[in-house]
Amino acid sequence: MARAKFERTKPHVNVGTIGHVDHGKTTLTAAITTTLAALGQATAKRYDEIDAAPEEKARGITINTAHVEYQTANRHYAHVDCPGHADYVKNMITGAAQMDGAILVVSAADGPMPQTREHILLARQVGVPSLVVFLNKADMVDDPELLELVELEVRELLSKYDFPGDDVPIIRGSALKALERMTANPKTQRGEDPWVDKIYELMDAVDSYIPTPERDVDKPFLMAVEDVFSITGRGTVATGRIERGRIKVGETVELVGLRETRSTTVTGLEMFQKTLDEGIAGDNVGVLLRGIQKNEVERGMVLAKPKTITPHTNFESEVYVLKKEEGGRHTPFFAGYRPQFYVRTTDVTGTISSFTADDGSQPEMVMPGDRVKMTVELIQPIAIEQGMRFAIREGGRTVGAGVVSKILK
């Protein structure tokens, strides 16, 4: 059967549900799809279809994630929901599903719980730009003052982690009530049921409050060098996949990382053995560089628009350490551990100088399965920026995955 063509008529946004276990993330995901299905803008998904998420591998780590898609009048959404808490942590750190925004689900009956806090913190550290809150199970709370209190508590928590707590839209509703109504009458439209209306209200907030992300092609040019070869009489060619932005023949680029940064001019572009006028994000290209010798470029450097990325050696990061069952280490490691950090296309040795747990304490050691903040010093400078993902490897196997939360030097 021929594949249906993906029609790009509306802007595309990636969202996800986050929040404490059993506060209703998966029920809400089901409620959104069934509600929008009445308009023909989604395929209704049952709770158990979302909950039985298939396993996926991202950077060697197994994650259970369910992906659903739906549309509103304004946008096309890809929505990710993870069944287990550990899956969220891994998903957010490895960037298996990059979220442009998230729906934080908080049970009105319980208020914010430890994982609510942890997911907000993670969202902040891995760079989820904006959150919308769904105060779920509002049907179980009779006292309006109690709802006010929970809402206030959520706003304070958001502010604590540098989200604009006063401005974040908070919608009160009941995913289960909406889902029950839609299941009883799948044609229910807006205005016909107060609980279903809350789902529409939530989607209005997601539509208007979560900004449309800048597309990769509109960002400044960056390509990690994968391979280098020389063409007699023409010069040196660096090949790789363009991570973001666009590049034309005649433009100036910088070679960043491993050595002194230097600039050069692009004198030719090729893709699939054909010449190219312009390369854009996602293309695998060969870039011919003026005045650069083959021994001056190596895998692990990046080609970038001048002054958009700089080389660094010291950074703070959020890291998930793989369990033994995931192919990780069998034993803990201590400060001073020197693994390889796999960034974009290359391994660089680095020393882990210190660890910090969520509560601010500095543990002696890190166990497989832990999530921890670590400070790293690389032996060579490479192009690093906040929000960048990396893997930690030892003897060719992945032992951890991380994201840069702060550049130190």
From Swiss-Prot:
Name listed for the protein in its UniProt record: Elongation factor Tu
InterPro entries: EF-Tu_GTP-bd (IPR041709), EF-Tu_GTPase (IPR050055), EFTu-like_2 (IPR004161), EFTU_2 (IPR033720), G_TR_CS (IPR031157), P-loop_NTPase (IPR027417), Small_GTP-bd (IPR005225), T_Tr_GTP-bd_dom (IPR000795)
Residues the record lists as binding GTP: 19-26, 81-85, 136-139
Biological source species: Synechococcus sp. (strain JA-2-3B'a(2-13))
Any single Gene Ontology cellular-component annotation: cytosol
Region (G3): 81-84
Phylogenetic placement of the source organism: Bacteria, Bacillati, Cyanobacteriota, Cyanophyceae, Synechococcales
Region (G1): 19-26
EC numbers, comma separated: 3.6.5.3
Subcellular location: Cytoplasm
Renumbered residue ranges of the record's region G2: 60-64
Keywords of this entry: Cytoplasm, Elongation factor, GTP-binding, Hydrolase, Magnesium, Metal-binding, Nucleotide-binding, Protein biosynthesis
tr-type G domain sequence ranges: 10-214
Keyword Hydrolase: yes
Role noted for this protein: GTP hydrolase that promotes the GTP-dependent binding of aminoacyl-tRNA to the A-site of ribosomes during protein biosynthesis.
Pfam families (alphabetical): GTP_EFTU (PF00009), GTP_EFTU_D2 (PF03144), GTP_EFTU_D3 (PF03143)
Keyword Manganese: no
Catalytic activity: GTP + H2O = GDP + phosphate + H(+)
Protein residues bound to Mg(2+): T26
Domain of life of the source: Bacteria
Family that this chain belongs to: Belongs to the TRAFAC class translation factor GTPase superfamily. Classic translation factor GTPase family. EF-Tu/EF-1A subfamily.
Region (G5): 174-176
Record region (G4): 136-139
Quaternary context: Monomer.
GO molecular function ontology, one term from the record: translation elongation factor activity
Primary location: cytoplasm
